[in-house]
């Protein structure tokens, strides 16, 4: 049985500003020593987006700055144990559940495992990248967050020419294009997700067996026996192109024999 990779436990010290700074510094030090990247200061760190862009145009207008890069996905530690599903959230995560019936998923005559609804861990990614809701639409906000600083627009990661979409400006003309980041709800031309990995127990000779209980030695992972967005992409390591868990030339052959 392949075990689900557990989400990192957020330390309660993260509620304290001083400790957040120290922990961030420690994370940067560790990542420098190991050669690994960090979400801090990356495109998924909405608290650092303003500094990285070199402008003061986004927090307070485009999205809310909650003071911690973790809470845009992870449940704040002061809400540890809370059930986000009771409030319309994705099970185990701090994002609202997308309208899953809206997705057109990949299908094929050769696909044995038909999936109707993405798993929670992939819904987490889609809740931003399908472009249907604001990137800061979290179920819980940190207790330390000042609601008077809430954003005016809560922009969506959507390439459309609408005031509520990032694509209004990020169109490749006024600013860099976000088109590749906006997946939409039609996923028929994307790699299938949330299906059981066919290489388990040598079930299909066209797929490689996993190396260990978490997936493969090169970092490609299996979650609850399934292939998910996070199987190939590692949001916590932005140093690799498009957040891949291994090099692009070796990614496909990690699973596929041909």
Task: Give a label for each model feature.
Residues 2, 33-71, 75-258:
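C-type cytochrome heme-c attachment and multiheme electron-transfer modules
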Residues 23-31:
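Bacterial N-terminal signal peptides
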Residues 4-23:
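Bacterial N-terminal signal peptides that target proteins for export
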């Amino acid at each position: 049985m392949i075990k689900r990779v557990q989400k990192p436990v957020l330390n309660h010290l993260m509620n304290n500003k001083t400790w957040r700074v120290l922990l961030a510094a420690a994370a940067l030090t560790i990542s420098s020593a190991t050669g690994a990247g960090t979400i801090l200061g990356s495109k998924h760190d909405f608290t650092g987006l303003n500094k990285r862009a070199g402008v003061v145009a986004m927090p307070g207008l485009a999205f809310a700055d909650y003071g911690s890069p973790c809470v845009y996905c992870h449940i704040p530690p002061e809400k540890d144990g809370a059930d986000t599903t009771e409030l319309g959230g994705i099970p185990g995560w701090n994002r609202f559940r997308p309208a899953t019936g809206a997705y057109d998923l990949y299908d094929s005559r050769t696909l044995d495992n038909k999936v109707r609804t993405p798993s929670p861990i992939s819904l987490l990614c889609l809740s931003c990248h399908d472009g249907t809701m604001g990137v800061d639409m979290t179920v819980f906000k940190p207790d330390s967050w000042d609601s008077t600083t809430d954003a005016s627009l809560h922009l969506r990661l959507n390439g459309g020419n609408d005031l509520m979409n990032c694509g209004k400006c990020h169109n490749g003309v006024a600013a860099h294009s976000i088109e590749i980041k906006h997946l939409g709800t039609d996923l028929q031309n994307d790699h299938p997700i949330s299906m059981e990995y066919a290489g388990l127990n040598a079930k299909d000779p066209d797929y490689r067996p996993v190396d260990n209980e978490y997936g493969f030695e090169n970092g490609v992972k299996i979650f609850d026996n399934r292939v998910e967005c996070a199987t190939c992409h590692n949001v916590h390591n932005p140093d690799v192109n498009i957040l891949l868990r291994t090099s692009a030339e070796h990614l496909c052959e990690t699973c596929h024999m041909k």
